[in-house]
């Protein structure tokens, strides 16, 4: 217990009791001030009630003085205790007085009929002060009335009457039995700590967070996909990734750029009977063959080979120059030809049909590679391979050099043994993900994602296609929980999963830092409309961008408020004043109010429902989650 909290717990009650004691006996002094019998009697009665009224007033003043404090609940308890002490003293004094006159009460009358009205008034004042203290002790700062314009509903709401979703409706829409954690079922802006900022290391700032039921999504409506926008340091991992990884009960793929989720969650998932795989470049011996799914479950090998080539070659949703577009398209065709040669020509053993072998073939000296392409064209058993190689056989050396340089650049990451091992290994198969009991954590840090996005694109694309190609023949749904997804760049398979993934057992939860990241990765402002149209829920929190705040304000809608207006006019004959009430339009939440939201508060949008303003499920505030989470490598000394 801090010193401030201890002082607030003791001082108000002590001052209330002291004031009551010090003002006792004032009835004689006040009565002496009267000049008539009636005045002396009235002042004497007031003096009897004065000690208790003064104590009650001090309690109320103390509560208003501590309004906005993090320890206001302690002050409320103190005022409650002080009010109770004052009432007990008043009752005790009155009992003693009545006991003294009980022998003189006429027969047939109750001694209670002689209770002093002044003392009763004073005790009532102390009672109401104690009730107010109890309210503050329970609700904190939320016990005080909040100022704001009066909202109008019904026929008079000419400018709109949008409102926040009620928590009862939110509980029906997002029951706590779901697997994807959305947030917590309470209004942060109405909590006792709403006036102070959220601090992870100050439990006093948490308020009701961590003690209320969860809001979870069970995929019952919409596409089942979700999008999260939260700024840097906005508790994305602690409020979305970790809680969802704890609750999700089916197949799970997590892109973990911080490499902290897997160590904290793996043991919990294993205890639930799940197979946990961590794809970490620093750990040798763990990897899968990114080409093992090609041609399975009814799809043609040629289509799948082209898909792999598009993942390696970073797609660009924006129009590039004709020259750049030619070399990139030709480089992708060269990669397609080399992958097809490894998989279809028939001269490569099954265990060697990997991307590592493709890179080995590509990294030969340019003249030797041209000779290999000629040999492939002449001896391949696949017409598809021949058709893709044919264009390079008689290509001019200068043009081929440009194509070769592009292909080598895009596959450069396959030269690193640890990166190549992740997509050319045999410790597990992509088919393992379809059984619904396999979890894969992709522990690629931001440096790797920035320098070699093709690595993560190949991993995620292979796992997505391994599920997609099964045409829904999977156990349960597989959740792809992708943090820092903008680092992957434009990935067409994600758009395919977005539009048709629900039917094939794929659920996406994608985490961005801002709208700008999404627009940069997926092609300007049109990207937001495409993704928002296909998302079941969209969450915004920890917003620092004014453009994003303006978008949220507009999407929340408008309300009609009643505004008091006063007009003053001054003339030669005097002045006049008139008052009127007007109906005006006001956004449900203004952009600057969005920017001022606490870090543990979010706004969630769903189709066909009012906007939801609720808390965030930060794992270290919840005892049920803290007990299941392992040590955080960034905070080894403290779990929280």
Swiss-Prot record:
Pfam families associated with the record: T4SS-DNA_transf
Localisation: Cell membrane
Chief location bin: membrane
Stretches that traverse the bilayer: 6-26, 46-66, 72-92, 118-138, 212-232, 440-460
CDD domains, per database record: TrwB_TraG_TraD_VirD4
Membrane topology: Multi-pass membrane protein
Polar residues composition-biased segments: 562-573
Record flagged with keyword Transmembrane: yes
Statement: the UniProt record of this protein carries the keyword Protein biosynthesis: no
One CC-aspect GO term: plasma membrane
Assigned protein family: Belongs to the VirD4/TraG family.
Protein name as catalogued: Conjugal transfer protein TraG
Organism: Rhizobium radiobacter
